[in-house]
Amino acid sequence: MTIKITRSDPRYAMLQRSRNLRWDGNPAEAAAEIELCETAEQAAEALQRAVNAGVRPTVRSGGHCYEDFVVNNPGGTILDLSLLKSDALPGDGKRYRISAGHELGEAYISLYKRYGVTIPGGSCFEVGAGGHITGGGFGVLSRLHGLTIDWLSAAEILTVDNKGHVALRIVDEKHEPDLFRACRGGGGGNFGIVTGFLFDRLPAAPYEVANA
């Protein structure tokens, strides 16, 4: 069950705000509610409720959106994935997984301590993986290793069909390759809600890093 935050909840004002204060939230255009999702299944249920109710869902991972795509959603629902941080590995466990709710700093630390690898992502540790990776995932290691999406092997994504049914699926180069390609930086992640990113291999973490 999701954690549902309505306008009457004292947490609403804080959770409705974006980290980008340029889009601080106009009360007249604010979302009716926020649903905090801790699993992909909860996100699917929340999305299905929004579809059934005929309201516009917007999605937030870390809240660093450069544009006003999420916060001001009159009468709609914000699906907040910031608590969706499962490290569970599918199948034989040979893939690395980053959930949409992970902040980049959390992903870097977990990958380094467990496996000695990294992703060539951004340098702001509080940016959410959900938005960063679906946007391409550029960072300080990208001149050496490319974009984060260059390493992406599969994506766990929620989609809605033409009958309004929500489905959770895993897409890759063999299973729905067009949708997988769209998840790799195309369209700003607007083809569905990506809840998890799967990597067959990742580059080794740098031996040392200099801060200037």
Regions found by a protein language model. Give the residues of each.
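N-terminal accessory segments
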Residues: 1-147, 166, 170-171, 209-211
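Long, contiguous hydrophobic alpha-helical segments, chiefly transmembrane helices and signal peptides
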Residues: 66, 129-134, 138-140, 155, ...
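Short, structured patches in soluble enzyme cores that scaffold and shape functional sites
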Residues: 81-83, 100, 123, 151, ...
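Internal, well-ordered domain-core segments that constitute the primary functional module
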Residues: 95, 142-169, 173, 179-182, ...
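C-terminal cap/substrate-recognition region of VAO/PCMH-type FAD-linked oxidoreductases
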Residues: 169-212
